[in-house]
């Protein structure tokens, strides 16, 4: 519970290169652990968009269309959610960078 997807799969990009866990290793270890292999920045600059484009090019989280239902001789309008012909928004640039969820840093206010 509380494990991120990459950590659960065994891919921990911010793991320490030193495998020891003794008292001497604790003093020598830095506050921010350097990643093994490729350099992974601790910040996130983009995210996947949660909105969709419809056929007309409108952008929204959900789309509805109005349908007319006749019941007992009375016409009544109902809204039906549209699921077809929607295009995902794609990658969205964030206004200000966020800290990566897998980066092991404790934030506190002084």
Swiss-Prot record:
- What InterPro entries is this protein classified in? FUS1
Q: What GO cellular component is one of the record's annotations?
A: mitochondrion
Swiss-Prot/TrEMBL GO biological process terms? cell maturation; inflammatory response; natural killer cell differentiation; negative regulation of interleukin-17 production; neutrophil-mediated killing of gram-negative bacterium; phagocytosis; positive regulation of interleukin-10 production; regulation of mitochondrial membrane potential
Q: What keywords would UniProt list here? A: Cell cycle, Lipoprotein, Myristate, Phosphoprotein, Tumor suppressor
| Free-text description of this protein's post-translational modifications in UniProt | Myristoylation is required for tumor suppressor activity.
Q: Where is the lipid attached (N-myristoyl glycine)?
A: 2
> Which Pfam families does the annotation name?
TUSC2
Q: What's the domain of life for this entry? A: Eukaryota
The answer to keyword Translocase applying to this record is: no
So where does this one cross the membrane? none
Tissue specificity, in the record's words, reads: Strong expression in heart, lung, skeletal muscle, kidney, and pancreas, followed by brain and liver, lowest levels in placenta.
Which positions bear Phosphoserine?
Answer: 50
> Has the keyword Endoplasmic reticulum been applied to this entry?
no
The record's similarity note reads: Belongs to the TUSC2 family.
Q: What does this protein do?
A: May function as a tumor suppressor, inhibiting colony formation, causing G1 arrest and ultimately inducing apoptosis in homozygous 3p21.3 120-kb region-deficient cells.
Put simply, this protein is called Tumor suppressor candidate 2
Species source reads: Homo sapiens (Human)
User: What gene name does this entry carry?
Assistant: TUSC2
């Amino acid at each position: 519970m509380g494990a991120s997807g990459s950590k659960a799969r065994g891919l921990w990009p911010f793991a320490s290169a030193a495998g020891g866990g003794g008292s001497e290793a604790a003093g020598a270890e830095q506050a921010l652990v350097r990643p093994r292999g490729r350099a992974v920045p601790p910040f996130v600059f983009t995210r996947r968009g949660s909105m969709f484009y419809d056929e007309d090019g409108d952008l929204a989280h959900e789309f509805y269309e109005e349908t007319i239902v006749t019941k007992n001789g009375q016409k009544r309008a109902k809204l039906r959610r549209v699921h077809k012909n929607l295009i995902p928004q794609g990658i969205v640039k964030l206004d200000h960078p966020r800290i990566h969820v897998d980066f092991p840093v404790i934030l506190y206010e002084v």
